[in-house]
C-alpha cells in the first residue's frame, strides 16, 4: 500500500480494511528499521491529517479516536469470521491475541488521543507524536506512572503463560 493512500484515504470509500489496519499499526506500534527521517516525516504528516487547525483546545484528537475504534471493530469482525466453524484458523490463540494484545494496542491509542485535551492543534500534534513513538506498554507507563504497574504485571504474567509451549499446545 503506497504511503499516500494511508494518509489520503482515511474514512473514504477506498479506505479498505487492509489500508486501515496498516495505517493504525503504523501509528500505534511502528518501529523504524532504517531511514528514520522519512518515517518521522510520514508519521507527522499522518498525525497532521488527524489533527487539523480546526481542532479546538477543549477537544481531544477525536478523528484519531474514531479511527482507532474503527480499527478495533475491523479486527473484531475479522476475528469472528476467521474463527467460525469450518475455518482453518485456530480459535483460542486468535482470541487471546485479540482480547489482550490488541486491546493493549487499542487502549494505548485511545489514551494517547485523550492526553491531547487542553492543547491547541500544534500541542495536540506534538503530544501525539511524543506518545505514539512509544511502544504501547511504555505509553501506558508514561501516562499512568506507578498506577499502571499492577495491570502491567498481570499482562506480563499472561504473556509468559501464553509463551509456555505446554499451555499453547492445550489451546
Regions found by a protein language model. Give the residues of each.
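Metal-dependent nucleotidyltransferase catalytic core
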Residues: 1-27
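General structural signal for secondary-structure boundaries
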Residues: 2-6, 16, 34, 118, ...
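Short conserved active-site loop signatures built around small residues
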Residues: 31
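Conserved nucleotidyltransferase catalytic core and NTase-mimicking acidic/glycine-rich helix/loop elements
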Residues: 38-171
